[in-house]
């Protein structure tokens, strides 16, 4: 079991055969950098063991930021021998579960089952896939609890630097959604688009999620108005994506809003097919190349999106 675990976390080669059903644990891929220290192995049953690991950096590499994650995966004895499986797959039977459309909802302790909001998310998935003509064969696993930290614990993430107690927070990892809300459309969009377009620029992913799902419990139109006031007042250099690393207050990021404004522009110019074309870009600069905007005109183009 231990030998297979060491081989399975090697990110330099295809390790899917070490995993039950070839499904690699999300948290390994998210926290593959740095060093791994397995500090405990606990028996859950005769066939399943829980493996507890800390992902960390040497202090010389990132001073003051040592622990990247504390997480759990499981090892299961199968006909092929010991294989790894997602922690949630091992313990999901402990949680109340409902299925609507393509979404499997799981509820932490004390969470009210609100079928109206669940239906909003399930219906949005079908409408979005139809609108964009996307070939999406995944099911979405939607975990909800009283806080994001509780949701994270359900999938085996005991700690990440992204811990938060904000009620509107959410997170999508592949086709897994963690949220305190059952109709968190921003994260639903991520759960669809991130697996389909893993190489697309992050600001497009945040843009399309913010365009349809808003951010910080505010719709896109509201945050666009806030960004408009900032863009009109401040002299922002839009020549590179680092210039977008600006907080507009109340957890509204200029990075997300500019991405959403570009999605809006693409829809106006060529509809959903134009949006999908932009997702073929590999970086920030290529997005503007596809839009036909050279670097000297980039700042004026982006400001024009807010007129």
Regions found by a protein language model. Name each.
Residues 95-201, 290:
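Juxtacatalytic substrate-recognition/specificity segment
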Residues 175-179, 199-307:
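Acidic/His/Gly-enriched intrinsically disordered linker/tail segments
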Residues 41-47, 78, 269-272:
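A short, structured loop/turn motif at beta-sheet edges
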Residues 2-42, 151:
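Short solvent-exposed beta->alpha transition segments
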Residues 3, 119-130, 191, 210, ...:
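Solvent-exposed, polar/charged alpha-helical surfaces in well-ordered, non-transmembrane soluble domains
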Residues 44-57:
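A short hydrophobic beta-strand element
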Residues 46-48, 68-70, 100, 137:
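Extracytoplasmic
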Residues 61-95:
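Short beta-strand edge/turn micro-motifs at domain boundaries
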